[in-house]
Design a protein with these regions (language model features):
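Active-site lid/adjacent beta-loop-alpha segment flanking the redox-cofactor pocket in flavoenzymes
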Residues: 109-112, 129, 133-137, 284-289, ...
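Helical element adjacent to the flavin cofactor pocket in flavoenzyme catalytic cores
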Residues: 156-168, 187-265
Length: 453
């Protein structure tokens, strides 16, 4: 709760994914007035809709490492590659790529991992507190996360990664093939191909969409206002601060409807990949670029044979999580702009790869038939808001009254609860208790209701 030094504010949150809703919850919990704007008819209908479902504090290494540049070049012409760079005539893409390359060294990798792990641990604790206080059910499984390898070279490299992550307090351990199959017997049919693996018992999984929507309902019940189905037209800047935001309802009908203005003491941009272009309109330039990810949700034919431990398949860099009577499988990143199509040749190849791989790993367990084969897999794509470091931007921008909570990449679900809590603390004039480089903490701009350092 806010204490005496923290004056209550009216805040407007732009975006109703896991980051935006978590922010709204924690702001409301502290007594701040909250209005959330989102273009969709409900919460969590874009990037938070059908992700890999993992709360992956322990498996959080940045994409940028010393091997990434050569791998990216090798994969450029492979439609099924884990990381596919699709060059565009887009200066933002190339600028982002150059910044990414600058992070592809051991020093930057360790520096980035340290912050990502710190935010992950803080966020996991915040999620547990949220679940305990709200009782939200979201197909949560606290069985840890396993990661299996199918070649000796990758398994050997995993041992080095285990040692590195232990430096930062991550209790990941190397396991033999036999031990891995004891942890998750569902992979026995594929066991001959598995070299070994790693395992962390503290990680978990659950449905991000269900959780986010339930948390949004509880926010509304506690007085938060929601403007669903509304587009953000522009941020209105007067002097060196944001004065208001202009929004308009999407279903305006033939007669049309004029936009209207919302004023507040603070504006929080949590629009995922769309945060960067919106922020640039008022002179805030953050390197957030969309990474197109894919998922498939398969009905279970043999529930007793489906994995209960959320697992990463290193061979294809995909993750799978049991969500009740379905298996969610997700992975691959495609850097090619804001394209959301599922019917392009590349998109179809990547979706069909998910079907083929699960049929290979878990034969007969799921209905993995493609639509062309008469099946009904729920293929989906979402844009992961990627930064070159994999570290999100959380805090106050150099424009007055304008805050940002975006750039979480593939870890939005993992970092969601803590990012929202941290944002509420920052807006209330406090510094969250973790080793993380928040925006504007050293000299935050004076805003009504906050304390300057």
């Amino acid at each position: 709760q806010c204490v005496a030094h923290c004056a209550l504010m009216k805040t407007i949150g732009l975006g109703a994914g896991i980051i935006g809703i978590s922010t709204a919850w924690h702001l409301r919990d502290r007594g701040h007035e909250v209005v959330v704007v989102d273009r969709q008819p409900d919460a969590a209908l874009e990037t938070s809709f059908a992700n890999a479902a993992q709360i992956s504090v322990s498996y959080c290494e940045p994409w940028a490492n010393r091997e990434a540049p050569l791998k990216a070049l090798k994969w450029m012409f492979d439609k099924e590659a884990p990381l596919l760079f699709r060059p565009q005539l887009d200066w933002d893409q190339w600028r982002w790529g150059l910044k990414f390359l600058a992070q592809c060294n051991d020093t930057a990798f360790e520096r980035n991992v340290q912050q990502i792990v710190a935010l992950g641990a803080y966020s996991h604790a915040a999620l547990k507190d949220l679940v305990a206080s709200t009782g939200i059910e979201y197909n949560r499984l606290e069985r840890g996360i396993a990661h299996f390898y199918t070649d000796q070279k990758s398994f050997d490299a995993a041992g080095h990664a285990v040692e590195l992550m232990r430096k930062f307090g991550v209790q990941r351990r190397l396991v033999s093939r036999d031990e891995l199959l004891k942890i998750e017997p569902a992979f026995k049919a594929y066991g001959d191909k598995i070299t070994g693996g790693t395992y962390t018992s503290t990680d978990e999984s659950g449905d991000a969409r269900v959780f986010t929507q339930e948390l949004a309902r509880r926010c509304a019940a506690r007085g938060a206002q929601f403007l669903y189905g509304h587009d953000v037209l522009r941020l209105n800047k007067i002097g060196d601060a944001i004065d208001s935001v202009a929004v308009i309802a999407r279903n305006t009908g033939a007669g049309g409807q004029k936009d209207f203005i919302l004023k507040a003491d603070a504006f929080v941009v949590a629009c995922g990949s769309y945060s960067a272009p919106l922020l640039r309109t008022v002179g805030v330039d953050l390197p957030i670029y969309p990474g197109k990810g894919y998922s498939a949700t398969f009905p279970l034919l043999k529930p007793e044979g489906a994995p209960m431990v959320s697992t990463i398949d290193d061979g294809k860099k995909i993750a799978m999580s049991r969500l009740g009577n379905v298996l969610r499988v997700a992975g691959t990143i495609e850097l090619g702009g804001f394209d959301m199509s599922l019917d392009s040749p590349v998109a179809r190849a990547r979706c069909h790869m998910l079907s083929r791989r699960i049929a290979e790993i878990l034969p007969g367990v799921c209905d993995t038939r493609t639509p062309e084969e008469g099946g009904n897999p729920q293929y989906w794509t979402g844009l992961r808001p990627a930064t070159p470091t994999n570290i999100p931007f959380i805090g106050q921008t150099r424009v007055g009254k304008l805050w940002v909570n975006a750039g979480h990449g593939t870890l939005g679900w993992t970092h969601g609860a803590g990012s929202g809590k941290a944002m509420a603390e920052l807006l209330s004039g406090e510094v969250p208790a973790m080793n993380f480089g928040f925006l504007g903490v050293q000299a935050p701009r004076a805003v009504r209701g906050t304390v300057t350092a």
